[in-house]
């Protein structure tokens, strides 16, 4: 295949004009002829650069508000012609087609239009047609043509040209082509995803996902696995949009756990008071509210001090100095919060390995979105679990109704259970978790494990009775038998919240009545795998 190919003519047509003038001046210094369109040509001329309008090349004016300008054989012939094919060369000569050796294009800002909530018609107008067509043509003919679709590649292009006397190597053009095809694929994905949402298409015939490389990692979940982090361009506050103030680069597991922690803490409205979540291996090991953020952290920490070591902490309010002081008493991997004051950041600065992330906002837990999981031969797609219940949604199914205090704790426990791996059992007392059972194959085992861990914690704290005494319990799915409920009662629970829907609901309700428990059904399940 052809290796070194000189660049004598370039077509520049960009929406994002950052770095454009420096690139164009450098190309002009290398004696590259510049061709351009519309606003790009105007910007180049305003900078004193010599440029030909694409209309001069095609002999056809731009029309229909710029919808038709580069969709012409004089452009696509110049991009697609094989320079070592005699028939192609004859055709070029016969029709006066000039070769285009370099294409610099970035596309209409469709993703930005969607992100700002533009109207349907405005989004349609921001779908680029000519740009992707040229990009694909140039990328296909990368044996002879360079295609640049990212401003981040301008420097590499100029370095390549200067290193090879105005020419580029095949390996360089191949890398550019790969980037170009990935860009058009991502662009089409953005359009199809937006349109599926706009038209409320629940299961489009074809579904694709795209991302932009944000970080390559040392490894994935385990050292033998390669990994990278890609962002999807959405504005949802979280680890992908956060500012990292200090600490080592985030690992694969850090990102996964931090996301889990922040999505849970966002369920607790900061206007209703401070809340803290501590996560280990994507499961919460402590969640609490408090009169202050420091108190919320301390109460969450007391749920499971052993598991909290080396964990991830998420806060629903900006980090303050008092909370920062408490957090630094043990080893913590990551702290994420909407903000952090200067004094808190100064305290953390002494802990060089502690990663601090701020997001300026919390994600909306009720916002629609998609979740997907890869399986062999395909992937599963579903709505994000934005399910929510309040007191009016609950059905009291036992003789005794929960007290106001129990009801508040039941709703708190239900919120936490939504974010615990199934089978999930969560004990809560006075707005704080006191036991979490996660990921067990049987519900009764999760119930017993959570109670046992709570008893161990009570002993470590020097308490006279288990933390679960007088608590309430949430179960992410129904109790198939009464055994799990009875285990919770034995641990000291006084009220239960669960979806209901078991064939043995009557048996479970009867057991609750006999034990003097209050129980409510939500009618909604929160499996999490």
Swiss-Prot record:
Location of the MGS-like domain: 2-149
EC number: 2.1.2.3, 3.5.4.10
InterPro entries: AICAR_Tfase_dup_dom_sf, Cytidine_deaminase-like, MGS-like_dom, MGS-like_dom_sf, PurH-like
GO biological process terms, semicolon-separated: 'de novo' IMP biosynthetic process
CC annotations in GO: cytosol
Keyword Transferase among record annotations: yes
UniProt keyword list: Hydrolase, Multifunctional enzyme, Purine biosynthesis, Transferase
Catalytic activity: (6R)-10-formyltetrahydrofolate + 5-amino-1-(5-phospho-beta-D-ribosyl)imidazole-4-carboxamide = 5-formamido-1-(5-phospho-D-ribosyl)imidazole-4-carboxamide + (6S)-5,6,7,8-tetrahydrofolate; IMP + H2O = 5-formamido-1-(5-phospho-D-ribosyl)imidazole-4-carboxamide
Pathway(s) of this molecule: Purine metabolism; IMP biosynthesis via de novo pathway; 5-formamido-1-(5-phospho-D-ribosyl)imidazole-4-carboxamide from 5-amino-1-(5-phospho-D-ribosyl)imidazole-4-carboxamide (10-formyl THF route): step 1/1; Purine metabolism; IMP biosynthesis via de novo pathway; IMP from 5-formamido-1-(5-phospho-D-ribosyl)imidazole-4-carboxamide: step 1/1
Signal peptide stretch: none
Pfam family, any one: AICARFT_IMPCHas
MF annotations from Gene Ontology: IMP cyclohydrolase activity; phosphoribosylaminoimidazolecarboxamide formyltransferase activity
NCBIfam families, alphabetized: PRK00881.1, purH
UniProt free text on domains: The IMP cyclohydrolase activity resides in the N-terminal region.
Classification via PANTHER family: BIFUNCTIONAL PURINE BIOSYNTHESIS PROTEIN ATIC (PTHR11692:SF0), BIFUNCTIONAL PURINE BIOSYNTHESIS PROTEIN PURH (PTHR11692)
Family under the similarity heading: Belongs to the PurH family.
The protein's name in its UniProt record: Bifunctional purine biosynthesis protein PurH
Name of the gene: purH
């Amino acid at each position: 295949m052809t290796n070194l190919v000189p660049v004598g003519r370039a077509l520049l047509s960009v929406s994002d004009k950052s770095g454009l003038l420096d690139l164009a001046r450098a190309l002009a210094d290398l004696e590259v002829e510049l061709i351009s369109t519309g606003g790009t040509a105007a910007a180049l001329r305003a900078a004193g650069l010599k440029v030909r309008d694409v209309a001069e090349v095609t002999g056809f004016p731009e029309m229909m508000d710029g919808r038709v300008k580069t969709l012409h054989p004089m452009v696509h012939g110049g991009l697609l012609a094989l320079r070592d094919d005699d028939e192609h060369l004859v055709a070029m000569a016969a029709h006066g087609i000039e070769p285009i050796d370099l294409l610099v294009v970035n596309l209409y800002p469709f993703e930005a239009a969607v992100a700002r909530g533009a109207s349907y018609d405005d989004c349609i107008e921001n779908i680029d047609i000519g740009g992707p067509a040229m990009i694909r043509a140039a990328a296909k003919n990368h044996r002879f043509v360079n295609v640049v679709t990212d401003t981040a590649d301008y420097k590499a292009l100029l370095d390549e040209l200067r290193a090879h006397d105005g020419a580029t190597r095949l390996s360089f053009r191949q890398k550019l082509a790969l980037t170009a095809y990935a860009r058009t694929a991502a662009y089409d994905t953005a359009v199809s995803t937006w349109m599926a949402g706009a038209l409320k298409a629940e299961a489009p015939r074809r579904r694709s996902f795209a991302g932009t490389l944000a970080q390559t990692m040392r490894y994935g979940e385990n050292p033998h696995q390669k990994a990278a982090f890609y962002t999807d361009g959405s504005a949802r506050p979280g680890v992908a949009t956060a500012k990292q103030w200090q600490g080592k680069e985030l690992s694969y597991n850090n990102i996964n756990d931090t996301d889990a922690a922040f999505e849970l803490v966002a369920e607790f409205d900061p206007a209703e008071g401070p809340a803290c979540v501590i996560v280990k291996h994507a499961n919460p090991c402590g969640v609490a509210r408090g009169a202050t953020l420091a108190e919320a952290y301390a109460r969450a920490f007391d749920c499971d001090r052993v598991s909290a070591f080396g964990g991830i902490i998420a806060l629903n309010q900006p980090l303050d100095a008092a909370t920062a002081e408490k957090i630094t008493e043990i080893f913590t991997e990551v702290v994420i919060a909407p903000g952090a004051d200067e004094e808190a950041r100064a305290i953390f600065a002494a802990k060089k390995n502690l990663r601090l992330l701020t997001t300026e906002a919390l994600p909306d837990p009720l916002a629609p979105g998609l979740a997907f999981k890869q399986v062999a031969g395909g992937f599963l797609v579903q709505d994000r679990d934005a399910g929510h219940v309040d007191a009016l949604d609950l059905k009291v199914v036992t003789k005794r109704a929960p007290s106001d205090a129990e009801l508040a704790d039941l709703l708190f426990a239900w919120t936490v259970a939504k974010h615990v791996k199934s089978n999930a059992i969560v004990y809560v007392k006075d707005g704080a978790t006191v036991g979490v059972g996660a990921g067990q194959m049987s519900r009764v085992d999760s119930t017993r494990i959570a109670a046992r861990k709570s008893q161990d914690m009570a002993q470590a704290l020097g308490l006279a009775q288990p933390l679960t005494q007088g608590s309430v319990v949430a179960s992410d799915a129904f109790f198939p038998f009464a055994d799990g409920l009875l285990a919770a009662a034995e641990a000291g629970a006084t009220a239960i919240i669960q979806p209901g829907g078991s064939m043995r609901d009557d048996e479970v309700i009867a057991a609750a009545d006999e034990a003097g428990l209050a129980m409510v059904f939500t009618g909604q399940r929160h499996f999490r795998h």
